[in-house]
Amino acid sequence: MVTKESIEVIAQSIGLSTLSPDVSAALAPDVEYRVREVMQVYHQLQLYFCPLISSLTCRRNLQEAIKCMRHARRTTLMAHDVDSALHFRNLEPTSGSKSMRFKRAPENRDLYFFDDKDVELKNVIEAPLPNAPPDASVFLHWLAIDGIQPSIPQNSPLQAISDLKRSEYKDDGLAARQVLSKDLQIYFDKVTEWALTQSGSTLFRQALASLEIDPGLHPLVPFFTSFIAEEIVKNMDNYPILLALMRLARSLLHNPHVHIEPYLHQLMPSIITCLIAKRLGRRSSDNHWDLRNFTASTVASTCKRFGHVYHNLLPRVTRSLLHTFLDPTKALPQHYGAIQGMVALGLNMVRFLVLPNLGPYLLLLLPEMGLEKQKEEAKRHGAWLVYGALMVAAGRCLYERLKTSETLLSPPTSSVWKTNGKLTSPRQSKRKASSDNLTHQPPLKKIAVGGIIQMSSTQMQMRGTTTVPQQSHTDADARHHNSPSTIAPKTSAAAGTDVDNYLFPLFEYFGESMLMFTPTHELSFFL
């Protein structure tokens, strides 16, 4: 195993160049004996501590390493060949081992040395000093913002999903199954199932309560909004499902912990649909009026909460409601939804949008309330509900104006009492007087984002023979300066005349019913 030449080479490597051949021949058997003793002890320890490792395994590893060496077209076995062999056999490679490149001495073929690179001392002295290691410090950065990891150097990029992993999809094909946890998937499936099949159950009510307060539901917001938008389109003739979807949308909008602003553009059209749609539900017994009332309050709360984030949200909603209210071709349930929506948005909407158009609208509504011209009971019932909504809206506006007005009331030019206590159509003289008053009233107010609301020919016919006077530039500029992002109110000079303009026409339209909305102090004026 150990020859005398090997002893001579080892002696020369440690500086013993005068070793005689006799000494080398005597040392070789002794070194070989001691190496065998060490190998025997190592073999015994290996069998004692690692009985699973045998010489056959070592031989196979060596064979694999030789294969790696030959594939690399080399004749020298290196450390990374052994590492590759262990890797191929699914074993942990060794660490700390490195192959060194030795050069053969030209004078002696059996002598090898490591070729170190010569370095000039001058270059070492003149080399710049390395940078001092920085002090230990802590840096803050965002791991995620609204559930989305920002692309910054501190955050490692997301690893690509392995092709070996299967993506879990349901029949609906939602790609969300890749980003939602198992708990959120089960939660979403259960809530959507209860909304479609068990909307009146206790479980669904508890789920709605959870949606209003749970702070961990932000990953589900885009999927709930998509679900609501899709199911409303599919179930326009199913009243229970529409009501359940509106309750679901309201719970999401009331949750202060979720970031729902980016999804309002997808959610608001569906909500507005449930407010001013022509038909909600299939059966005549479906109480779609309550659904419209519930949706109106949802629209108002949404505009109140997110109006400062999206400045065009309130003008766009108001414009949609006003167009529906002024369109005589729309059905009475649509008018009812538009009126309730504007009432829920605030009394200023009623004052600026509903009251100026109240007289012409009642001229078209009164025939629908009478048995003589309207034979269908359902349409008469709808007309009376619209009439009641207008009366409540006008009464609330009247009450607030009387409470805040500091001007003295001027006496009416005609009697404001109805003699028989029943709703009757105004006389022709009153119609003419009402039309004359409308010519002096301000036009529809300007919405800052939407601009002047243009009226179609059918809407102009709804006003009868009245015409809208042109606004002066001074008046329009003053209103636009006072309120840049909402419907422009009247100027302070004309604010005091609103009571005189609308008070007595309201008593003519609704009779003694307005007394319910008159404050006690102002009521003495009529007694």
Swiss-Prot record:
CDD domains: HFD_TAF6, TAF6C. GO terms for molecular function: protein heterodimerization activity; RNA polymerase II general transcription initiation factor activity. One of its GO terms (cellular component) is SAGA complex. Gene3D superfamilies: Histone, subunit A, TAF6, C-terminal HEAT repeat domain. Residues 410-442, 462-492 are annotated as: Disordered. Residues 416-427, 462-473 have a biased composition (Polar residues). Expressed in roots, leaves, inflorescences and siliques. Keywords: Activator, Nucleus, Transcription, Transcription regulation. Component of the TFIID complex. TFIID is composed of TATA binding protein (TBP) and a number of TBP-associated factors (TAFs) whose MWs range from 14-217 kDa. Interacts with TAF5 and TAF9. TAFs are components of the transcription factor IID (TFIID) complex that is essential for mediating regulation of RNA polymerase transcription. Not redundant with TAF6. This is Transcription initiation factor TFIID subunit 6b. It comes from Arabidopsis thaliana. The lineage of its organism: Eukaryota, Viridiplantae, Streptophyta, Embryophyta, Tracheophyta.
